Structure formats: C-alpha cells, structure tokens
Amino acid sequence: KRQRIAVPSARRVLRHMVSHLIVDARDRQLGKAIAALRDEHTRLNINLLGEAILGQGEADRRLEGIAALIRRDDVDYVSVKVSAATAPHAPYAFDEAVADITERLTPLFELARDRDTFINLDMEEYRDLDLTLNVFTALLEQPGLRDYEAGIVLQAYLPDALAAMVRLQEWAARRVAAGGAPVKVRVVKGANLPMERMQASLTGWPLATVGSKQEADTNYKRVLNYALTPEHLAHVRIGVAGHNLFDVALAHRLIERRGLDPAAVEFEMLPVSYTHLRAHE
C-alpha cells in the first residue's frame, strides 16, 4: 500500500522538477503543454524521449509514438534518431543497416511529408555519425521524398563536424540542381561527452570527440562560418541550436555582414533559455 502511494507521488515530484525541460507526452497533457509554450515567435521541436532501443518491438513502439506525434494538428516539427528505428545493428553490416533503417523510416518521412511536418534526423553517439548521414541522404534521394525538406543534426564536438557539413552541402547542392528541395542542418555542440568518455575509458580507444569545451566551441564557429554564406544557404538552411548567447550573436552578425537571408537561419534553444532571453529583450 505504501508503494502504491509513494510511486505516484514520486512521479508528480519528478515531473514538476523537470517541467521546464520535459513535458508530459500523454495526449491531453501534451496538448496543454504545447499550447502554453507556443507563441507567434516560436516553433516547437518535439523529441520523444525514452530508453535505448534494445529490440525490434521497442523500435516499433517508438516509431509509432513518433508517428502519433506527426498526426497531431498541433505538432509540425519532430525529431527521430536512427537508433530509434531498429534494434542494435552489427557494425560490420553497415550497408545492410543503412538499407534496413531507410526502409523503416521511409513511411514516417512520407507521413510527415503528407502532414506538412518537419522531421529532424537526430544524432547521439559518434558511432552513429556515418550511419545517420547515409540514412539521411538515402531517404531523401527516393523519388517520393525529392521535394520534401527535412533536417539532420550535426554535433560540433566531433572532429569530423566540418567535413560532414561540407559533405552535406555538396550533396544538397546536387539535390537542388536536380530539382529537389533544400535541406536543413541543425548545428549543436553535442550532449553526450560523458558517454563518449566512458566508452573510450572502457575500451582503451582514443576519445571520439574533441578534448575540451573550448575546442567544441571553436569547431562550432568553424561550422557556422562555413555554412553561413549566400551560396551555401541556397542549399542548406541552418539551425543555430544552443543556449550560448555569444554563438547567437555571432550568427546574427554574420547574417548582417554577409547580407544573408534571415529566413534561412533558425535559432533553437530549450524553452527555459528562450523564456529568459525574451524576458530581457
């Protein structure tokens, strides 16, 4: 009996503690949260959180949960990771993994296209970098998705970030030249450094990310400097994602000095950071 009382109470306390970061995904509660957060200046990126996917049944449930979000009239932007699409894959079966995940994500992208909902292909661990890039391009090279604009996340704390941006830019330029839609790259610092450090320490491998916050900040600015030009924004819109106001100011200055189209650049941050920023305008 005590357990039946304690667990619901603990859930309520936990939800209250993280309410500025995470909203309740249950249908009625989510609708209220979206209505409270949205205003004329904002667009909400809804990311369905959950434990790591370990089996196909879990992957099916996660994808159905994301599809349910896309079907909502009050949702127009969602994120999904390649690791949510299928059970863990064998690293030596890379091509098969790309084909399998592309097949599983295609119905989700087609649903988003039909619902005019933006999908962002998110990234988590370094080992998913090439997989995510290849799945993203394979999805959007399909004839039915040629005119659909989707996005992908790029983590600046990866040493490969600038090279990956160049690769995406060159691919997007060919896509647009062939009559396809531009794409969007959401540039983030990266949020899994403790996990990457743990993985490196357990295996004895070199750290996959850069070694310090300063290096990550520098890499972030390298990516923005490359991406924020008229010729590059014609193919790849940019999401400047993060709560560092210096990075936001830098992006604004580059837009002004280079005469860029402000509509081609979006600024993304957590609700608590956005609310604080708006309060001090």
Each model region followed by its residue ranges:
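Conserved, mostly hydrophobic/aromatic
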Residues: 46, 121, 240
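Phosphate/diphosphate-binding loops
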Residues: 151-171, 185, 281
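Long hydrophobic segments that form regular secondary structure
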Residues: 215-265, 269-273
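Active-site-proximal loop/turn and secondary-structure-junction residues that shape catalytic pockets
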Residues: 48-54, 82-86, 123-129, 154-160, ...
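Interdomain boundary/hinge elements
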Residues: 144-158, 260-269
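Aromatic-lined glycan-binding groove of carbohydrate-active enzymes
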Residues: 179-199
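Alpha/beta catalytic barrel-like cores
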Residues: 1-117, 134, 138-144, 148-150, ...
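Conserved small/polar residues in nucleotide/adenosyl-binding loops
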Residues: 275-280
